[in-house]
Design a protein with these regions (language model features):
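Residues within well-ordered alpha-helical secondary structure of globular protein domains
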Residues: 29, 52, 120, 130-134
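Active-site-proximal N-terminal segment of extracellular/periplasmic enzymes that hydrolyze or transfer
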Residues: 115-123
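Charge-dense polyanion-binding interfaces
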Residues: 129-143
Length: 143
């Protein structure tokens, strides 16, 4: 949620993916400073969104999602590299051990992540896994 009179039109919204870590690049952009290559390796400025541009800010988002799980979002898709919630379930709930080795959700069609498509789209799983491995190897999502 943001308010910036004369810049952000009231009642507007965006479906763009942004992350808390994007604040660093956005603040640098606001003051007219470019981030050094080694600063904020996963930070993208979303200042253009605040100014009304509706262009993609970040190509993907990688997040450590608890207990050895990684979450990777690109476009409409979200890959989770493990079973269950990664430790975010209510206390006392059993950890799921049955089912696919990971989770894949189409967030446009299933924002609540109820329909795991991991076994139905192995090509998307492979593509996102390859992208995530590159992020893990380089230690960054920003070029």
């Amino acid at each position: 949620i943001a308010s910036w009179p004369t810049t952000i039109a009231p009642g507007t919204s965006s479906d763009q993916t942004i992350s808390f870590c994007d604040l660093l690049a956005t603040f640098a952009d606001l003051v007219g400073t470019e981030l050094p290559h080694d600063a904020g390796p996963d930070s993208f400025s979303f200042l253009p969104l605040l100014c009304g541009e509706d262009k993609e800010i970040r190509p993907s988002l990688a997040v450590e999602a608890g207990k050895n799980h990684m979450s990777f979002r690109s476009g409409d898709w979200k890959l989770i590299t493990g079973k269950g919630s990664g430790g975010f379930s209510q206390r006392g709930q059993p950890i799921r051990t049955a089912g696919p080795d990971g989770q894949l959700y189409n967030l446009v069609e299933d924002i609540r992540e109820q329909n795991n498509l991991y076994d139905k789209h192995p090509e998307i799983v492979q593509h996102l896994t390859t992208m995530l491995e590159k992020v893990k190897e380089t230690g960054r999502t920003r070029e």
